[in-house]
From Swiss-Prot:
Residues 1-87 form the Pyrin domain. The gene is Ifi203. InterPro entries: DAPIN, DEATH-like_dom_sf, HIN-200, HIN200/IF120x, NA-bd_OB-fold. One of its GO terms (biological process) is activation of innate immune response. It comes from Mus musculus (Mouse). Residues 92-102 have a biased composition (Basic residues). Coiled coil: none annotated. Residues 190-388 form the HIN-200 domain. Belongs to the HIN-200 family. This is Interferon-activable protein 203. Keywords: Nucleus. PANTHER family: INTERFERON ACTIVATED GENE 207-RELATED, INTERFERON-INDUCIBLE PROTEIN AIM2 FAMILY MEMBER.
């Protein structure tokens, strides 16, 4: 089932550290019949695909839970996986009950319909059945219909065609609007302020136009893993994309229309792992993206707007740095605009980026969080940071003040 595979990949394998993932592969090697090369080369998506093939009933979810229960650092993850599995099973039971109830209603409805039709026929006056009908033939002459013909319903060519259409295209009731709007495409005429979200595996293809791309960068120095970020759009919405195959830089050219398939939606991003997931659009490669949509997709949010957003939101934008403070394991920057200011905390590899007050920073995939009642942006594993220009140091008093004392 697709639900089980989503749990295995998105809730399980994607939440493991690299060492933990390698441990799981090792412990499942015999049951999955992994060769040495497969064990070394398979990434999380490939392993999830292989588990689905080997255990089609639950995509190997039970096997993964048992393995996680034997690994000290993954016991909490095993509990979460059990909870997610229970949710799917409960949902499935609910669907079965609903289907059984609907079947009974349909059978009752059919019986009622048959009864009504019979009663309707009985209620037709006998004088009406026996009355001879007069109609015109194609030649204009009048023709009398026999009693038997008069009793039959009209079957003109038009009516026959309508009946055939009804049989071939049964009437469908309009879909009931979903209570959740997270996966809805915006209506034409409305310009979204936030990227659209999709969750789980999507086969596609989805045709999009590339709007903006970062340079490729190394996000894991130990295993030399590289990636780049992109912003793409359809005519009605835009998406943020993580691309984990840097060979695809040749496809992600601003203004180019491409088709993406077999991508994974996760935490507000579309994730692409293989070059085969992206292809050129050769037939009618035209897409009209409005200027307002393009501007909204790449716009920098105001600080006041960020302060109102939920924790866990990922932020892209270009901000002016007015203050810097170096710590033992991180660097804290103060960024601001005419609506307020905020702290940005960077860790690991991004502490090697040289940036001084007065410069403008481009931030991509920074997580909004808070500590000590102060909102801030922090770097995560896939964050990207670039100094756009080095300006003169700013006067901190020229930027509206919020409390940043815990960081400076």
């Amino acid at each position: 089932m697709a639900e089980y595979k989503n749990i295995v990949l998105l809730k399980g394998l994607e939440n493991m550290e690299d060492y933990q993932f390698r441990t799981v592969k090792s412990l499942l090697r015999k049951e999955l019949k992994l060769t040495k090369k497969m064990q070394e080369d398979y990434d999380r998506i490939q392993l999830a695909d292989w588990m689905e093939d080997k255990f089609p009933k639950d995509a190997g979810l039970d096997k993964l839970i048992k393995v996680c229960e034997h690994i000290k650092d993954l016991k909490d993850l095993a509990k979460k996986l059990k909870t997610e599995k229970a949710k799917v099973q409960e949902k499935k039971k609910g669907k079965c009950k609903t289907a059984g109830k609907k079947k009974g209603q349909d059978e009752l409805s059919s019986s009622e319909s048959l009864f009504i039709n019979k009663e309707s026929y009985k209620s037709v006056p006998s004088s009406k059945k026996k009355r001879k009908q007069i109609t015109k033939t194609e030649g204009g002459k009048k023709k009398k219909l026999t009693q038997e013909q008069a009793q039959l319903p009209e079957t003109s060519g038009t009516n026959i065609k309508k009946e055939e259409d009804c049989l071939q295209n049964p009437h469908k009731s309009p879909p009931t609007p979903s209570s959740s709007s997270s996966n809805k495409a915006p209506r034409r005429g409305t310009v979204p302020k936030e990227p659209s979200r999709e969750e789980g595996h999507h086969q596609g293809p989805k045709q999009v136009m590339v709007l903006k791309v970062t340079e490729p960068f190394t996000y894991d120095f130990e295993e030399t893993k590289r990636m780049f970020h992109a912003t793409v759009a359809t005519e009605t919405e835009f998406f943020r994309v993580k691309v984990f195959d840097t060979a695809l830089m040749s496809k992600f050219i601003p203004g180019k229309i491409i088709a993406i398939s077999h991508y994974i939606g996760c935490n507000g991003f579309l994730e692409i792992y293989r070059a085969s997931c992206v292809s050129d659009v050769n037939i009618n490669p035209t897409m009209i993206i409005s200027n307002t949509l393009s501007e909204s997709a790449i716009a920098t949010p105001k600080i006041s707007y960020l302060l109102s957003q939920a924790k866990g939101t990922f932020v892209n934008g270009e901000f002016v740095v007015f203050k810097k403070s170096e710590r033992h394991e991180c660097i804290c920057y103060g960024i601001g605009d005419d609506t307020g200011k905020m702290a940005v905390v960077v860790y690991g590899r991004l502490t090697n980026v040289r940036c001084e007050p007065g410069s403008k920073l481009r931030l991509v995939c920074f997580e909004l969080t808070s500590t000590k009642d102060v909102c801030l942006l922090r770097s995560v594993r896939h964050s990207y940071m670039q100094v756009i220009n080095e300006g003169k140091p700013l006067n901190p008093d020229s930027v509206r003040r919020n409390s940043l004392e815990p960081y400076f």
